[in-house]
């Protein structure tokens, strides 16, 4: 069974036992969370349930396996001949989730 979930403003296609990295979710390592924003779910051999915009009663249960930070990206702005330069860095905080169960009630 698979599902398309929305987490942190992005969409992810997940299967059972898959591991994904999403934007930071507060929680302890090893704790279980429920993701209620399921946009689509189904099995590969059967028709899928497509939400309008969400599938009612669908829940994805996941476990927080790691809290980490992504690689640094550099933002550099410059205006030629004006001696204007700005450099900034950013490291996004991420949460690694292991998908345990996909259910529809």
Curated annotation (Swiss-Prot):
Pfam families named in the record: Ribosomal_L21p (PF00829)
SUPFAM superfamilies: L21p-like (SSF141091)
Record's keyword annotation contains Hydrolase: no
GO molecular function: rRNA binding; structural constituent of ribosome
A GO term from the CC aspect: cytoplasm
Protein's job: This protein binds to 23S rRNA in the presence of protein L20.
Alphabetical UniProt keywords: Ribonucleoprotein, Ribosomal protein, RNA-binding, rRNA-binding
UniProt subunit comment: Part of the 50S ribosomal subunit. Contacts protein L20.
GO biological process terms on file: translation
UniProt record similarity statement: Belongs to the bacterial ribosomal protein bL21 family.
PANTHER family: 50S RIBOSOMAL PROTEIN L21, LARGE RIBOSOMAL SUBUNIT PROTEIN BL21M
Protein name according to UniProt: Large ribosomal subunit protein bL21
InterPro entries for the chain: bL21-like, bL21-like_sf, Ribosomal_bL21, Ribosomal_bL21_CS
Gene label: rplU
